[in-house]
Amino acid sequence: CVSLTLKDHRQKNIILIGDSGAGKSETLEALRQVASDYVVDMTTIFDDMGTLLIEDNVMKAYGTEIGAFVRTDDLENGYTYKVFDRAIFMNPSLSNARIVLPISSYDDITTGINIDYILYANNYEESANKIRLFDNVASALEVFKKGARVAKGTTGETGLVTTFFANPFGPVQLEEETNVLLDKYFKYFFDNDIKVGEIYTGLALENGAENPIYAATELLKKLKED
């Protein structure tokens, strides 16, 4: 989840959902690059673990960590050297190397923000339009619950795989309880004009490393038009 402050002082808040290797980090990093002329601030509210709470019929998003556990391959060239003095490196000489680094303040993650977009990261399908918005709960839930992606070597999986709600930690073990929450929250999204859709990161396609730029460019266009 990231919070963007545009140069016209509007705030846009986006959640990307997808399992490991779906292209979430790559797309957000690409957005940081293409949006530099239009965005004055980009704050990470949560990297992996976030919470959505509905209180008095108002939904807010909160983070649960002030750091990130990310793949070094997902970061811009040279970034790891910039944070060398405040980061923890894991298996830096191997593939799928990881780094733990601080990305947000405690105030950032605990204030609670409204959400404008909730997008599923699709890394395996080609699409001329890089963002597809759903017009009903059923269509959205079908995609989000399926949790499909092509494994990118970040886990032990290979090929096209599915994980219930793109999360092996919780939803899979408590599917019945998760379904109750998904029905409630997705209904809230559509009832309150929160845009729910799919963003085609293309990370598992040919020339995958270049594709998130196209997805980020289309996302920026939509943010500017809103």
Locations of the language-model features?
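Short, surface-exposed amphipathic charged segments that create phosphate/polyanion-binding patches used
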Residues: D8-H9, V58-A61, N211-L219
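Conserved NTP phosphate-binding and transfer environment spanning the P-loop NTPase/kinase superfamily
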Residues: S93-D226
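An acidic- and aromatic-residue-enriched active-site/binding cleft used to recognize and process polar
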Residues: K7, D19-G21, Q33, D47-G50, ...
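Conserved nucleotide-sensing/catalytic segment adjacent to the nucleotide-binding pocket
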Residues: V39-D108
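Hydrophobic/aromatic beta-strand patches that form the interior of the parallel beta-sheet core
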Residues: I14, T43-I45, Y62, Y117-L119, ...
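N-terminal pre-Walker A segment at the start of P-loop NTPase domains
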Residues: C1-K7
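Flexible loop/turn segments at secondary-structure boundaries
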Residues: A22-S25, T51-I54, F69-V70, E125-A128, ...
